[in-house]
Amino acid sequence: MLYFIGLGLSIKHLTLEAIDALRDVEKIYVDTYTNIVPDFSLDKLVSLVGEEKEFVMAKREFLEGKNIHFIVEEASKKNIAILVPGDPFIATTHDAIRVEALRRGIKVKVINGLSIYSLAPSRTGLQAYKFGKTVTLVYPEYFKPYSTIETIYDNLDRNLHTLLLLDLKIEENKAMTIPEAVDILIDLDERGVLENIIGVGLAQLGSSMEKIVADRLADLKNYTYPPPPHSIIIVAKPHPIELDNLHYVCGLPEHIYRRYSVSKTYP
């Protein structure tokens, strides 16, 4: 049997169902390349699920390409788990393994975990149904990511917030920070609207070092944050309740809160 198990954004997010399954399997592949879980360590995992099994700290090459068939073959003979940061199939990274296992007639069980998609609206008080398409901002090494800006513009035109995931290149030990992202966004902003729009900086969301800051997007770079993972929410025109949450929950400065409490225009 093959388990796909969500780790959440902290090792403390593992559910009882997840821990029970991890205790029962013979081998655990720990996905180490799709996200950073700040408080995760193999020692902590072993203390929760026991050491009488094989642990593999899996880089990209372990879980993609030709190795998919190896993992599926293993799962045909014994119980295997792939432990994934966040929720296993919010992104499509491991879909090929699931499809191949099912094609071979191998049982697959998914145990869900907490994801930034649920935590971001919950922690900030922004309404989940007012989020548009999520997009990733990558480092502009070979090209400028104008498609990211176009997605943000499309969402704003429909009065929808944008959850902006920031580039992670874990195997290169490189992770984009909120200040870096702000500089890139303002450089790409041909409309000149993003600088003064409300942004929410999310650092280590869901961990004990979590930091959430709301301010003008341009001013998010002036705060100190714990190390990545970082994300940003580009806020469309907020509902009055959302505006209250941005102020009282996320620390939106008083002068911005008061301005948009009475203003009919945004930003």
From Swiss-Prot:
Catalytic activity: 2-[(3S)-amino-3-carboxypropyl]-L-histidyl-[translation elongation factor 2] + 3 S-adenosyl-L-methionine = diphthine-[translation elongation factor 2] + 3 S-adenosyl-L-homocysteine + 3 H(+)
Molecular function GO labels: diphthine synthase activity
Enzyme Commission code: 2.1.1.98
Keywords in alphabetical order: Methyltransferase, S-adenosyl-L-methionine, Transferase
Pathway given in the UniProt record: Protein modification; peptidyl-diphthamide biosynthesis
Superkingdom of the organism of origin: Archaea
Function of the protein: S-adenosyl-L-methionine-dependent methyltransferase that catalyzes the trimethylation of the amino group of the modified target histidine residue in translation elongation factor 2 (EF-2), to form an intermediate called diphthine. The three successive methylation reactions represent the second step of diphthamide biosynthesis.
PANTHER family: DIPHTHINE METHYL ESTER SYNTHASE, DIPHTHINE SYNTHASE
Protein's name according to its UniProt entry: Diphthine synthase
